[in-house]
Amino acid sequence: MGGSQIWLDTTETLTVHEMLKAICVVSANDCCVAMAEYIAGSQEMFVEQMNKRAKELGMNDTTFKNCHGIDEDGHVTSSYDIAIMSRELITKHPKIMEYTTIWMDSLRDGKSELVNTNKLVRNYAGCTGLKTGSTSVALFNLSATATRDGLSLIAVIMKGETSKIRFAEAQKLLDYGFSNYQYALCGSKGDVVKCVEVNKGLMPTVELTLENDCGALIGKGQNKNVTSDINTVSYTHLTLPTIR
């Protein structure tokens, strides 16, 4: 297999929690294969699922040939596709950041030390992850994520000549984003945006509320120029029964 490993033994048992920790912190390729086999029955079947999901997400320049990213003919992607995948991961599965923000930890009752391969976790304020990768062909790569003042950014660096370069270039991109942009909150989860009449209901009206927070990315200092117009479904009244 090659690459980063924690040298799993066929006789030992690790929990999913421990496997995820090893994958996220030290890029354990053997754990990637073990998890793929656990989820799909084999690495090959898991890779099929990976490619199917990639197409669903619009990752049009990506073809996976394995589950760990080691160089293989036809195994390709782009920085844009990595950004799409990273966004999907941190927005739909935010619990992953409990692993990607670990700087140092251990497995096997402290016998196996884990130190995060992503140095920004320790050195960059607000860093939430996400993943490093390096091979002799792809060189040094990084999908870096960070959050400050409600604004989350992703910076993807590919084919850096050295490990230091990938971290420095990612930091430059993140610094630029945080220096020039901010997140403007337009409405909070649960805010009432409209009241709609209900025909033959116990109550004459029903409130339409925001399912989630909503906002927009704006230039720094442009708050005063932001107005919100929440477009609701053009109902003037509802007839029971309704389906939420």
Functional labels for PLM-detected ranges:
Residues M1-A83, I90-K92:
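Active-site-adjacent loops and short helices of periplasmic peptidoglycan-processing enzymes
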Residues A36, P241-T242:
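Long alpha-helical scaffolds
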Residues M59-T63, D71-V76, Y80-L238, R244:
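Domain-terminus/edge residues, biased toward the C-terminal soluble/receptor-binding domains
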